[in-house]
Amino acid sequence: MEQEIIHDIFFSYRHGNSSGDARALHERLKNLYEISFDVENIYSGELPDILYKRIDECTDFIIFVAKDTFDRTLNSLDDKDDWVRIELAYALKCNKNVIPIKVRIDDFPRNLPPDIAQICHKSGPKYDDYYFDAFVEKLRNYFLKSKAKPTYDFEEYIPVEKRKVKNAAEYRETILQSFSPIDLLR
């Protein structure tokens, strides 16, 4: 029988606008933490049940906030399929360590609905393609409460200039090449 994995971190993001950024961060952290990342490890079952269970078990909830992340939320306040809002509202209700990662934006929308408005009072590092290593270290050292698992992958100790992939833009390009166009629209 397969052992059930308990996730440390839950990734929430709007497919299409920050998929590549979420994937790049997942690639960097996956050897250090158990991450609930839908395109990697959500299989069959009732989606709401799986998502709620994963949020319940995680310590950290990372939400990638890009320019249009909350457009769907603001346009229809009762959209039952707005998973970004549903996930965020549940994580806030459960008092998870919610870490917003702003992706190429400076501010949150001003008129968020009450069940998720508290996100405006949460802090997180701003996503940075160019200084990706510094961004990841800041996230790990100052925002994540989950403890990293021991690893024998020494790439994180290799100087950036000697790595095969040096920054998030290169990660994203490499990763997006492995996606089909259908994956990007989900």
Regions found by a protein language model. Give the residues of each.
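Conserved N-terminal substructure of TIR/SEFIR domains
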Residues: 1-67, 84, 92-96, 134, ...
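Hydrophobic/aromatic beta-strand patches that form the interior of the parallel beta-sheet core
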Residues: 62, 99-101, 125
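Conserved TIR/SEFIR loop-to-helix hotspot centered on a Trp-containing motif
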Residues: 67-96, 106-108
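Short glycine/proline- and charge-enriched loop/turn segments
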Residues: 72-73, 116-122
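Glycine-rich, charge-decorated loop segments at or immediately adjacent to ligand/cofactor-binding or catalytic sites
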Residues: 106-118
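Short acidic-hydrophobic, aromatic-tinged amphipathic segments that line or gate anion-handling sites
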Residues: 123-130
